[in-house]
Amino acid sequence: MKEADAIKLFIGQIPRNLEEKDLKPIFEQFGKIYELTVIKDKYTGMHKGCAFLTYCARESALKAQNALHEQKTLPGMNRPIQVKPADSEGRGDRKLFVGMLGKQLSDADVRKMFEPFGSIEECTVLRGPDGASKGCAFVKYQSNAEAQAAISALHGSRTLPGASSSLVVKFADTEKERGIRRMQQVASQLGVISPMSLHLGAYNAYTQALVQQQALVAQSAYLSPVATVAAVQMQQLAALNPSSIIATPIASITPSSGTSTPPTIAATPVPALPPPIAVNSYPPVPAAPNGQSASEALYTNGVHPYQAQSPALDPLQQAYTGMQHYTATYPAAYGLVGQPFPHQPTLVAQQPQQPQQLQQREGPEGCNIFIYHLPQEFTDSEMLQMFLPFGNVISAKVFVDRATNQSKCFGFVSFDNPASAQAAIQAMNGFQIGMKRLKVQLKRPKDANRPY
């Protein structure tokens, strides 16, 4: 029978020819085994070189970890065996974060609140440099069951004096989760949640003008199509006029039928746009799932451009005839409203993607970065989550040892533009996760054919 506070262990660096029956003799000496499962690929069934192990008793797991972790190397392996709590166990499953405490509460007050649910090993109110309470604390029980009982009974149950909301009681984050959250906070502070806002703030004003145009169309779908298109054309010309600072507001438009008057929509002042970025030196990047190219999505923040109607209805095309070759940079500036005239052809043809480019896993030159000193447990998905705040990620890959399927603690991330890559390097190089500091650098052209 398994104890309530039994620990699930992750076993790494085991030979791929060893199955459960071969591993049992190694671990049975520390106690009765409740469950031992070799981890295999769910699609291919191939051995991944690691396993999960749960003893009936918590004490047995601690003994096995102390005796084996990085102490013994199994035949055929280059590195010693790894024996440590699985990620699901490492969630601080006995350690709770308590928020929305009154700032006058002491450690003893918090301990008294949580003692009815079990034996407390640690209880600490977090305080600032001046000694003042931050209104939160960590409480660590002896078992997961006790921690669960405290969450069930206390979370959201009351609002303490001096707190702005009800009591928060939840499992504390792991080191990995804290690291990812800190990375995202750094990215947010640098202003790079929108990938180009760090360097190209004026483009966001351009996007805002497009959003307002779409709002106009959505609210005036019952208008005469010609009147709607004409109004939006005027708004686009005003927003894109380099010599103008304030876009002309769109006044009320009298509908062709009915008595209702649509709401007036005024444009926010839009600064003059900087010269377009020359994108012709970079090869086309893969198309995004919504049909936009990745470069188009970058400069429009995901706003879907409306299809153009006809040359006769597009004064922008006539006014800016010298800018056609920048359509990858300002694609939505050449489209009119598509709703009044559905299923019309696009005026400016987009460059077709080549099949081999759709399968491309690297970005253009200057858009690919290497990351060294990653935590051992980081996977592709966590790498992706770490670098998404800096821009559109084409691929994120942690390098894995083929023999052991264990991380080599480095990887690469490919963006679809150099600015995002530079922003990621600026923010993340030297960033500390646990005991490690990340090393983030640009992949040099001469590295193109090297795996690392």
Curated annotation (Swiss-Prot):
The lineage of its organism: Eukaryota, Metazoa, Chordata, Craniata, Vertebrata. It comes from Danio rerio (Zebrafish). It is found in: Nucleus; Cytoplasm. Belongs to the CELF/BRUNOL family. GO terms for cellular component: cytoplasm; nucleus; ribonucleoprotein complex. Keywords: Cytoplasm, mRNA processing, Nucleus, Repeat, RNA-binding. GO terms for biological process: mRNA splice site recognition; positive regulation of mRNA splicing, via spliceosome; regulation of alternative mRNA splicing, via spliceosome. This is CUGBP Elav-like family member 3. One of its GO terms (molecular function) is mRNA binding. Its main location: nucleus. The gene is celf3. InterPro entries: CELF3/4/5/6_RRM1 (IPR034648), Nucleotide-bd_a/b_plait_sf (IPR012677), RBD_domain_sf (IPR035979), RRM_dom (IPR000504). RNA-binding protein that may be involved in the regulation of pre-mRNA alternative splicing.
